[in-house]
Amino acid sequence: MTSILDRYLNTEKYQGVMRDFCNAQILNDKTKCGLFLKENVLSRIGWNAEVSAFPDAEEYEHTYNNGDSNKGLFFKTPRMVILHCGFRKDTTFIENSDKAGIEGIYPRDSFLYDDWEEKNPGKPSPYKRRRLILMFLVNKDGVAVHKKPLILSLHGGASNMFCDAYGTFIEQLESAFAEATGQKGSVGFDPKQSAAAIFTPTFGAELYGTSAKSWISYPKQWVVPTAKTITNFFPKNNEDIDFIEEVWETCPPSVYARPFFEQCEKEIGINAIRPGVDFNLAPINGGQGTKALLGARDADTGEITLD
């Protein structure tokens, strides 16, 4: 039976547009540590699941340090698929905390750290690395329970500890896969295979830092795969894996990062993008040779000048 809606499935005639992204938040609270989706986020992403579909999930009203509060859903043990930027080596963005702006991509623009040290010897660097994880929450069969992907924005200890946990989980999954398929050794997954892996962490809290410590939330433990249980760690149907792979292919960090930071600047006045920052170039290996390889940058525009 045809529907008037069928005409709008013609993607050559009706091309979709990218809307503003929605944030998932990690609550860095000693007693309430986990993932939080605000009520307005749930209404925008096409949320279609019951709270009971997730272990340790509940309706919750969170009060922030400034006194503002938001209702939403809290997940102590979210069931996630991480499409992009879940590994330590993945792309991160260099944020100047003094100017609340994005000034480069790490490791490509790691010369920014060298420049700061040269001009401000002995002073603490204002730069930190902002990580934008693209993710879905999924049900027990690996089906996404919302129509639009979420962005989880992390930095500092929360970013490091999340990536360490996720990276360990993927290596456990690779070993279980090798054993289940009769391979003598395990190899790293293709990124698209990792993107479909179901990561189910339970968050805990830890004091993090050197002199000024603060509470951060991190995946304290997670459901560990074995050769016998490995099929539970991927979506049950090929169509759902195809969907995840399609989003992985069509929405890399070079596509979603710039609009996300522009949205932050518009809504809360931070993370303005410095003129000249190119989100389209693939990151290259950083280190001492990066500055010489890329050449100097104009102090005002950030444009590269090659001698």
Q: Language-model segments: what does each one mean?
A:
Residues 129-231:
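Extended serine/threonine-enriched, polar tracts that run as long, contiguous segments within proteins
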Residues 24, 205, 295-297:
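Assembly/interface hotspot detector across virion components, adhesins/toxins, and nucleic-acid enzymes
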Residues 1-154, 186, 213-215, 226-233, ...:
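OB-fold ssDNA-binding interfaces and closely related basic DNA-contact patches used
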Residues 84, 89-91, 215-298, 307:
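Long, highly charged low-complexity segments enriched in Glu/Asp and Lys/Arg with interspersed Ser/Thr
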Residues 11, 24-28, 179, 250, ...:
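Surface-exposed polar/charged interaction patches
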